[in-house]
Structures are given as C-alpha cells and as structure tokens.
Regions:
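Glycosyltransferase specificity loop/lid
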Residues: 1-427
Length: 427
C-alpha cells in the first residue's frame, strides 16, 4: 500500500465476466469504490472489448470507459486479458467453446496480471471478482489477498445456486429418474418457489452437467470469499439476505446505478440512441418502453404477438430491437408494422435505457426481467410487464410479480399467446 497525504490508498483488482449484464454493474461499482478513495484496476477480456469496439460503442483503445470518472480525479485503470480464444472468434455463435475457454483458460491470464500488479505502486491488496468466475478464492489465497465475491443478480438467485445440493438431494434437479414438480420449500430464506421459477438452466437436461460443473465450482469458490457483495436492496430481499448472512458475510450494496457527481461508465455494447427529443413531445405516462436486453433472443411468433398487442393498444412506444435479438429472418417484426405505427412509436437498435425510464412520458416497461433492468425500472418508478426469456429471468419475474407486486405477467418465452398479449396491452 502507498501513503498519499497521510491517507492509505487501497488498490483493488476488479475482474468482471464478459457479458453486458455483469459488466455494467461491475463498472459502476468500480466507480463507487474509486469515488471513496480506492485505486481500481478493472479487468475484462480482449474478446469482450473487441465486440464492443467492433460495434462502435467504444474505440479500440477503450480509454473512454472510465473517462468521466478519471476527469473527476478518480484513479481507475483498465486492463485486458485473453480468454484463450482469438479476438475475432464468434463467442455468440460458438457458446460451448467460449464457455470451455472462459472456465478453463482465463485463470492463467488473470494470474499473470496479478503477479505484475503485485509489483505495481501501490500493489493490489484486494481481489474483487464476479461470482461466476471459478478461480478467485484459489488465486486470492495463493497471493495472500482478501477476496470479495461480487454478485450481480438477485439474492434469491444466489440462494438457489448456493443451495443447489438441496435441489439434488430432494429430487428437484439432477434426478436420474423423474424430477419433482411440487413447490420447493426447503431453501433457507425462501418460503416457497415453484420449479418453473428456477433459473432456466435447471430446466435443460443437456445443460445439467454444465450447471453442476461450472456454476457449482464457482459457488464453491464463493464459499471461500471474505465478503459477498450483492447488487440488491436490503429492504427488497430481507428474508433471503438474512438467511445468507447465517452462511457468509453477505451484504446488499445496490441498486448500483451512477449517482450524481460520480460520472457513469461507458458500458454499452452498442452505440446508444438519444430518444429524449421524441419523448418530450409525448404526454406524461403515455409511452410503453420495450426492451429484451443484451442477450435474449425472441422467436418470430412471440415477436409477432407482442407487436400485434402493441399495435392494438394504441399506446405510444419505444421498442429496442438490437441486432440479433429476434429470429434469423430479415425483419423481426410483422410486415406493415412500422407503417401502421407511424407517428406514435420508435423502433431503435439500442438506447440510453435509464434516461428513457426516467422520462415522465414513460408509463410502463415491457421487460425480459434482466436484473439490471428491474433495478433501473424500480429506481425510476416505472411498473413492469414481465416477459422472462432465459437464465435468472424466470426467478426475477417471481420477485417482481408475486413478491414485490410491482409488475404483471405477459408470459414467458414460447408462451405468449394472442389473447394473453393483446389482452394485457389494453389493461
């Protein structure tokens, strides 16, 4: 550690994982640490950076990611490491190969960087890592550093993964015969949850072994953490947080959104369109915002039914349809949709989501239930229409609709039906 004007400066190595939903809260939390006097070296992969640069979201050098924070005097440094694959490798098309490289090859490159930064001035003195990395506790112990596990999802989802052995023991997951379908009532801090509300990976037989191997290993590492920091709010998940605190030093540190005077990180995968001028021309609470996040893919049938619901509702709307978010067909929307909605809607490839949600013209959010989107929607006071697609989104839907009661169901992937979608659009 170094001493600057009598103040001890801690140097945190912060390693995220290469997905938008993890990168964004990690980058914004890094800024919060730096605003409180930490030196932060923020690490992501060369492949993820190349993806962002190729889309035009950042320049090749990537210096603007923390440009605002650095202009305010914060000491945030950026480092890139290899995930073991060429930067031009299509990680979206070849998910299994990417997953294998991420879980098996990334560690050696992070370890090499750690050796270098232990000789820096000041040297790193704490490791912060996304919980889904499978090596942080091991490396932290190797170099004598405290390890902080950073969880970007809901505490409820953490509890499910943390207690996956209970699902196996009770026959709700990984059963060699028939998997139980009744309510799960034995996870500490979770009074009851239906199997259909579990993370989507638990419903995919071919993914079962990957869940047990990779996520299981990651959570074994998390059990070796000195602290677990979760991007949630104590008051929203008090019961499950209390139960987790009986197991680990577990703290809610959310919602992690940029505060005034901190500066935000440039975290988008794509250039962001400013919709504010169009929103200014709309009456209060008259606009439905629609976005299915940075990864989810929606079938042509579901896109069509949602589009018909939007068309029949007569509401104003902003619909984010990023490249690759729909089916492989040239146009993800029904023929004639754009013309029929002319004058009351915008279809954009990407936008500044929090800016849109904060605008008084926006009265609702049709969301895939990604955790960052849910937190932003709550932060901005916008009710949600829930359409979970994959991963933790079905579990998040349960929180929003059943526990917190700040949203309603549209359906889930493959379940959108004409009456349901068109009925909700006019509710």
């Amino acid at each position: 550690m170094a001493d600057l004007e009598g103040i001890t400066k801690h140097h945190a190595l912060f390693v995220t994982v290469p997905f938008q939903g993890h990168f964004t809260p990690a980058a914004n939390f890094a800024i919060k640490l730096a605003a409180r006097g930490f030196i932060v070296t923020f690490v992501t992969t060369e492949g993820f950076h190349h993806q962002r640069a190729a889309s035009g979201a950042v320049s090749v050098d990537g210096h603007e990611v923390f440009a605002d924070a650095r202009s305010m005097g914060m000491d945030i440094r950026s480092e890139l490491v290899s995930d073991g694959l060429p930067v031009s490798f299509d990680r979206t098309l070849h998910r299994d190969q990417f997953s294998d490289a991420f879980y098996h090859l990334l560690r050696s490159h992070v370890e090499e960087l750690m050796r270098k930064l232990l000789l820096a001035e000041p040297p790193i003195d704490v490791l912060i890592s996304d919980t889904f990395n499978v090596w942080p506790s091991t490396l932290a112990k190797k170099f004598g550093l405290p390890y902080v596990s950073f969880w970007t999802e809901a505490a409820l989802v953490f509890a499910i993964y943390y207690h996956v052995h209970l699902l196996v023991e009770n026959g709700h997951f990984g059963s060699p015969t028939e998997t139980r379908k009744d309510a799960i009532m034995y996870i500490p801090g979770v009074p009851s949850i239906e199997p259909t509300d579990l993370v989507s990976f638990f419903h995919s037989p071919e993914a079962s072994w990957r869940v047990l191997r990779n996520v299981g290993k990651a959570f074994e590492e998390a059990k070796g953490a000195d602290f677990v920091l979760c991007n949630t709010v104590q008051e929203l998940e008090a019961e499950v947080i209390g139960a987790l605190q009986q197991e680990r030093p577990f703290y809610a540190v959310g919602p992690i959104v940029p505060a005034s005077g901190e500066g935000g990180a440039a975290t988008s995968l794509w250039p962001e369109l400013d919709c504010s001028q169009w929103l200014h021309s709309r009456p209060p609470r008259s606009v439905l915002y629609i976005s299915f996040g940075s990864i989810a893919r929606v079938s042509k049938r579901d896109m069509d039914e949602i589009a018909y619901g939007v068309l029949g509702s007569k509401f104003n709307f902003i619909w984010v349809i990023r490249p690759g978010s729909g089916s492989s067909e040239a146009s993800p929307l029904p023929e004639g949709f754009i013309e029929a909605c002319k004058g009351r809607g915008m279809v954009v490839p990407w936008c500044r989501q929090k800016q849109v949600l904060l605008h008084p013209a926006v009265g609702g959010f049709l969301t895939h239930c990604g955790w960052n989107s849910i937190l932003e929607s709550m932060w901005c006071g916008v009710p949600m229409l829930c359409f979970p697609v994959r991963a933790d989104q079905p579990t998040n839907r349960k929180l929003v609709v059943e526990d917190l009661r700040i949203g309603i169901d549209v359906g889930s992937i493959g379940e959108v039906r004409e009456r349901k979608c068109r009925g909700e659009s006019t509710a």
